[in-house]
Structures are given as C-alpha cells and as structure tokens.
Amino acid sequence: VLADFESKGELSRWYHANQLRQEKSIVRHGSCSARVQLSTARISGVTLLHFPHDWHGYRWLRFSVYNPLNGPLELNCRLDDSRHRRTHGPYSDRFNTQLVLRPGWNDLAIDLEEAEKAPKGRRMDMSHIAGFSLFVVQQKAPLALFLDHVRLN
C-alpha cells in the first residue's frame, strides 16, 4: 500500500499537502480517505513524493477516486522516474493519461507495463519511480475529490 490515509501523518508525504485533509465520511477502504481540494488554477492537484520508489515487478497501480459531481470529470495521471525529474524532461518523457471519472467511486488501474513504455525513445526506470500525480486542468470552479487505497500489485 502506497497510501491509505488511515493516519494524518501520511498527508505530509504528498506535494501540495495543504490541499489534502483526512476524511472519514466518504471512504472506499478502511476508515479514512484523503479529501483533495482542487482550485481553478491552470493545473491543480497533488503528487506523492515519499514512497517506496522501486516498482519493478509490479503490474498495476490501483487507487480509488470519488467524484462528487453529477457528471463526468477528467482527471490527469502522471508518473515519472528519477531521470525525468533530474533532467526536467519534456511531456513526452513521462507517463501521462487522462481518466474520466463517473459520479461516485471510481476504482482505477494504471498498467505499469504501459507506463514503462511511455517515455519517447526510452523505457521508464521502474526501479526509480520519482512521482505519482493526480491533477485537473483549468477547472471552472473549486472542487473536492476523495482519494483512497493507493497501492501496487
């Protein structure tokens, strides 16, 4: 498990942790989730930075996101390795995908074999994953999503 939000201390492992709050009323797994407050900034989201970085041997990144809206919401997912971070590589040098969240809970899975092949001209170093980000682009109004049970398998 990369993050299950059962303790408040877990929130500090995320970049933009000030946008996160432990939540007990909307939960997918266990007794807590993370409330992710998103703004109308061009890009608004959170990034997991402090976690086991060796993902070699895992096939899936799984997590659950609750969409409180009455309609679909586009959520972007980004994975990058230490080389991308070190060289400030371009968009094409990392894994990017857009997920469409339906209202309510969405149980999502990222195929790590696809992520490994995503950087143009090279393979992502799955033994040195540097960040996992979830974000929205140019939201029209502030919005809170709920994130739970982030894990590898």
Locate predicted features.
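Beta-rich carbohydrate-recognition modules and glycan-binding surfaces
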Residues: 1-153
